[in-house]
């Protein structure tokens, strides 16, 4: 939403997670992923919840490994870089979730920004969606300690 001076304002809705992975703020998503100001706040919240659930399923084995080793929260992991007290694992988690949420919201973004969309809008939107989902998958692979690609001998 825009204020009278054209300054964007972001919602301050905290989305509660499962206790291991960090809670996320919908306003952080709006700011970091440059969502259109006309986008419905509740729709953004729902997309983030869906992305959280999707990432949590993919990260279940990693979470179980941490719990088995006495680490009860992603915030308690002490390896890796930190920014303002937030560790690399939590930052990666947030980035993976936000990439998936934005991929989910892309069709809505297109209708907010381009009412008379060109004929290639659907293709660009699908390409961007694929890039965002690939970004999320790369981050999750990194969280598991894997590189961008893996070769396995059959």
Q: Where are the regions a protein language model picked out?
A:
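Conserved short "hinge" loops at termini or chain/domain junctions
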Residues: 1-77, 138-141, 145-154
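Short, exposed interaction segments that mediate macromolecular assembly or regulatory contacts
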Residues: 68-93
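Short loop/turn elements at secondary-structure junctions
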Residues: 85-154
